């Protein structure tokens, strides 16, 4: 009675016939090959950003290092670095601070969060400072304050204009009150430079916040800013909880500050060198 015979409820497979090949691993894509734009959220092929690291879709300015900015700004081989080798005394003996400094120096190739020296911008000699957010968020400690102060003192003595690219997360907490003192210290040097009739120009880059904003970043004779740069003192949430109001979406953006008279002009990164040269030519080093 084959009609009612039992059948196996499973299928027999010869194990020798089964494929024993391991699934192929997916090809690895290098992390540095693509970047996601914080502005338009598009994924961008790294080469499409160009040398100035600007999003080709929305114009967002990616953060760049001090040396990258130096190459975009000054005449070739004109930069002479000054005030190197200054080290913090670590006044609070803050845990792991010295180790963090050592690792950051190795990673960035900088001795501190600001690069200082003299350079020419289309033939105009200037004292130049560039803060780098890759170095502990360009927080302002005693060495940063000392280097910028010395830069202004040198510029005053040699009758040079000062161009300073600012970027900072604020005062460096690992140095306590000593970091806050740098606000007044640098501002005093700025005032002496100004009293000598010399020209000081600041360029606010993303982010410029905290004590740097509350002092020398906003003391320039002319204040420029990069597109969509975050500029402010306290954080947005702190302000909203204090005033108990919802702030505008573009609050603390460079465009908002220019609209309210705190910034003189917003300059595209690709136009910055020409703009600086023009302003230096207009002023001739004099304010």
Curated annotation (Swiss-Prot):
The gene is accD. Belongs to the AccD/PCCB family. InterPro entries: AcCoA_carboxyl_beta (IPR034733), Acetyl_CoA_COase_Trfase_b_su (IPR000438), ClpP/crotonase-like_dom_sf (IPR029045), COA_CT_N (IPR011762), Znf-ACC (IPR041010). Its main location: cytoplasm. PROSITE patterns: COA_CT_NTER. The keyword Ribosomal protein does not apply. Binds 1 zinc ion per subunit. One of its GO terms (molecular function) is zinc ion binding. One of its GO terms (cellular component) is acetyl-CoA carboxylase complex. It comes from Streptococcus sanguinis (strain SK36). It is an enzyme of class 2 (transferase). Pfam families: Carboxyl_trans, Zn_ribbon_ACC. Pathway: Lipid metabolism; malonyl-CoA biosynthesis; malonyl-CoA from acetyl-CoA: step 1/1. Its EC number is 2.1.3.15. This is Acetyl-coenzyme A carboxylase carboxyl transferase subunit beta. Acetyl-CoA carboxylase is a heterohexamer composed of biotin carboxyl carrier protein (AccB), biotin carboxylase (AccC) and two subunits each of ACCase subunit alpha (AccA) and ACCase subunit beta (AccD). Component of the acetyl coenzyme A carboxylase (ACC) complex. Biotin carboxylase (BC) catalyzes the carboxylation of biotin on its carrier protein (BCCP) and then the CO(2) group is transferred by the transcarboxylase to acetyl-CoA to form malonyl-CoA. Residues 33-287 form the CoA carboxyltransferase N-terminal domain. It catalyses: N(6)-carboxybiotinyl-L-lysyl-[protein] + acetyl-CoA = N(6)-biotinyl-L-lysyl-[protein] + malonyl-CoA. The keyword Chaperone does not apply. PANTHER family: ACETYL-COENZYME A CARBOXYLASE CARBOXYL TRANSFERASE SUBUNIT BETA, CHLOROPLASTIC (PTHR42995:SF5). It is found in: Cytoplasm. A zinc finger (C4-type) spans 37-58. Zn(2+) binds at residues 37, 40, 55, 58.
